[in-house]
Structure formats: C-alpha cells, structure tokens
Amino acid sequence: MSSDVIIKARHLAKAYKLYDSQGDWLKQQVAGSIKTYYRSFWALKDITFEVEKGESLGIIGRNGCGKSTLLQIVCGMTRPTKGEIWVKGRVAPVLALGATFDLEATGRENVLIGGAVLGLKRPEIIEKFDSIADFAGIGDFMEQPIKLYSTGMRTRLAFAICAHMNAEILIVDEALSVGDLAFQKKCIDWIDNFRRTGTLLFVSHSPAELSRLCNHAIWIDNGHIREGGDVANVTRAYRKATLVEQDSMSRFSAV
C-alpha cells in the first residue's frame, strides 16, 4: 500500500437483517443461531477502493444504492459484515455528526458535544465557538434545543462544526442540498479551500456537483461499484445510463 493512501477499503460488504414482523424478531432472539427468522439484505457487496492524501473522491449513485451505508462504514458509524476498512487521520463527517446531535440540548451544547466526538478538547472547542456560530448563521437559535431546528439548520450547525475541526478528511453527503443557496455557496467555497491540503469524500446523485468538486469518482449501483476512475469518465457513464433508463421508462409508460 502506498504511503500516500489515507483510506483503503477491501471487499466491503454490509448486510442488514429484515424481519417481516416484530414477532419474528422476538423468535430470533430466542432461537439464536438454531433457526433464522429474517431475510438478509446486502446494502453493499464487494466494495474495494483506495483514496490517496489530497484526493477528492466523488461517490455517485441513485437513492438506495448504498452510498450512505458506505459513508457510515468509513465514518465508523457501523461495521462491515465482511471486508476491511482502514482510515488514517482525523475525519470530519457531516453526516455522522448530525446524527449524533442531542435533540434536547441547545445548539451551543451540541457544539461542545460534537467537538468532543470529533476529538477536540473542551478549551479548543470554546476557543472556536464564536467562529462556528458565525459560520452556521443560525442566530439566537444557537441557545435553543436542537429539536426546534429545521433539517437545514441542523445541517448548518453540523457543517460549521466540521469546518473548524482541522480534519485531514472531510466527508460530505447530500445533506448540503437542504440548505439555502447562500449557505450552499459558503460551504462550496470552504470545500474548495479545504481541497488544497485535505482529502474529500463527496456523495451525490448529481454528476454536475461531482465534476465541480472531485477529480476521481466511483459509481455505486445496487451495492456494487459499477465504474470507477476519472470523474469525467464516471459521470459520463452515469449520465448515459440514466438517460437510457429514463427513455426505457418513457417508452414503457407510453404503451
């Protein structure tokens, strides 16, 4: 493995247990490994890739293809059922951080919690607080419980915290699309600056967004990597396949 590799995934696979009823779940707890009362759904199947330091990797695919599951594994939110993941350096995951917010705590309190989750000491977080609050731009809501926040406000706060963590790896998912245009531009400008020294994983179903921010990409389809390599080649193939599928659906609906 190259010394410049900062993320390495080898034959990753992730299965979830699907139960038809709560009764089946209870039966499984009693039966243990003797009998199976669930169906396995494989969200990821044999995913292998590497990301080098300073690279910007885009991950594209339709909703439900496995993109978010892959991010959760890279972030450490969940473990793969099979395979190995290796990550070197401090990770700032917007997706994961937003999921850990304490809904009863205020925005201010969640800045302290989020900073601690990402490995910062309390004095460091306090020193950065005013800058985080200014970046988030949610005003007096910083002193209100997170449960009162809109999805966009939660995303603002999560991104603002991640932007101040001095991380080597930034992981951004499609959550940015819920913000207003001015905040989206602020985030994109910040990401552009981060890319000069950091490593980016950017997840989207928009070829234009990937082309704007990434130099390499992987296309996930039904849990598999369908194509990987230069972002222009991957997004071109994705666009073509999407158009073919849309054309087929139009023909079918016209019959």
Per-segment meaning from a language model:
Residues 60-62:
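The feature captures the beta-strand-to-loop junction immediately N-terminal to the Walker
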